[in-house]
Swiss-Prot record:
This is Probable basic-leucine zipper transcription factor F. The keyword Transcription applies. PANTHER family: BASIC-LEUCINE ZIPPER TRANSCRIPTION FACTOR E-RELATED, BASIC-LEUCINE ZIPPER TRANSCRIPTION FACTOR F-RELATED. Residues 405-468 form the bZIP domain. Residues 155-206, 271-360, 563-609, 618-631 have a biased composition (Low complexity). Its main location: nucleus. Probable transcriptional regulator. The gene is bzpF. Belongs to the bZIP family. Residues 407-427 are annotated as: Basic motif. Residues 46-117, 154-207, 264-406, 546-631 are annotated as: Disordered. Residues 35-62, 328-366 form a coiled coil. It is found in: Nucleus. One of its GO terms (molecular function) is cAMP response element binding. It comes from Dictyostelium discoideum.
Amino acid sequence: MSLIEGDSIYNLFQTQDLGIDFASSIVPDSPNKFKKNANVFNNFQQQQQQIQQQNKQSNGLIYNNNNNNNNNNNNNNNNSSSSNNNNNSSSSNNNNNSNNNNQNHNNNNNNQNHNNIQHNNAQSQVYINHNSNGSQQEEQLFSIYLQPEKENELNNSYHDNVNNNNNNNNNNNNNNNNINLNHAQQQQQQHHLPHGQPHNNNNNNQFYQIKNPMEEIYSSNGIVPNQEPNKKVEYMNEPIKQNHYNIVPESIFDVPFGVSSQTMLNVPSTNNANNNNNNNNNNNNNNKNINFKQPIQPNQLIPIPPHSNQNNNISLNNNNSNSNSNPNNNNNNSNNISTQINNLNNNINNQNNQLNGSNNGKKKEEDKSIKKRKFISSTPVKGENGGTTLIPTTDGGFNMDEERHQKRQRRLVKNREAAQLFRQRQKAYIQDLEKKVSDLTGTNSEFRARVELLNSENKLIREQLLYLRNFVTQAVSFSFPKGGSNGTNSPSGVADQFLNSILPPGLNSPLPQGILPAGMNLQNPMIMSAIAEAASKNSTFRQNIQGNLLGTPIPSPQSSLTSNSGNNSPNKPLNNNNNNNNINNNNNNNPSSPNNNLNNNNNISPNSSTSHQVPYLPQNTPPQQSTPNQR
């Protein structure tokens, strides 16, 4: 893993306890990678040679000088963490003071911008592994910690100087040379360190008690390094992973760590952001902050804070100005950060709960309002097939005007539907009545036709009966025999026999009285000849006679009368009681004489109603037949 910016890391870990993981895994990048700015590290290399000489005397201690310039006073305080004896540490401090004074003087005169590599925090403590050959030190480091395919992807981005730790109002830039132990050398020099004794702490840069590097140094941030100094750090603390880290699984990709961490933490950018710089000096220390674009290895822990919707007003920079550095201050700072983070998390949870509660309350109110609605009416809607369906309507009670409008529309629809149904029923009723009237009219016309037919038949029957009655009367009067008191020889008996012979069986009813004169003999050939002559002169009569002779039944007068009375004919039947056939027999002495018969036939009483009751008889009556005596 390559160098990570100290600013982003220290923004996460404000105390020194949380930043001790740089001891074994994080190293500065090589200056040879930046050919354009190769002179930046010249002073650093000179200091490195002096440190190597000093390390031979102090059992391999390594120093990293962090120089801050001042126009008025250049107080170079060398803070040594541990040494074998006080003489060696004091001598090394004196040597470093002399060298640092020269370097600071050159930097102030020439306005050089690269006095040291500042990662936005003066407390960024960089540990360098020591080797006997100082020239090969950086090559070995980068061969171990950098991958060859990622070396060409390193970038150096320059930002304005952000010196968060120059808090001296006295215009004094105290250049504190913070000397920290390497992990391997700290194990060798544990018995030489003063327990719990901090050194010169003008800018809150201090050494602290180191009892056990596996317990004390790494206990605060949960980082457990390997025993070998040249291997990477393995993070084993699971709760810290859950709270502050995400693991990138089995992938390598490049992320500018400084930019990504600042955007995730809502930390303001470092451009022109001098948060705690209260110096009134005129020194333009344009120290370039070099941000490295580094590859993220698989299973690497990326610091990600808890999500927050509010502006995190937590100052993650070191704002300790002119304060006495004590171990308790570090604990207080860490406690403050943890409490602030907890407060933010609580606020977020409260807001989420409020939002969820408000949403749930609204849903419950809507559900209650829906449950309170009742189906107060049903709206008839005309379907596609011509039928109507009833759709239930709900009363929400939200808007009175809208509700009134809906009621009015429902009422109009009901009225229209009722009117339509009434018109349909009325039309069906009228059509039924019209059909009945048409049927009755047809039957009435049929009955009228039948009545006319019956009237015409009745008229024809009357004409035939009246016409035949005259002929029969005349024939009987001519053939009435003389004397003969027997019943068989009487005219009535003969007429009955003749009629019975002519009429079909079942119609042999006795003839009415008064049709034939008494004593008329129908067996007389003269009577038969008279009937035949009359029939020859009248075609209708001839047809009737032929029908009778051939066996065709001729209706009797009674049947014709009953048929006329059954048909309710308006024309009343003839009155058979008229004495039209009553012949006045003046000659009672000679009733059988032919002359008297002729006279009797001709002398018809004038009171007879023949001419009145039968006005439609034909005028061309058959002529009277002559008697044999007249021949």
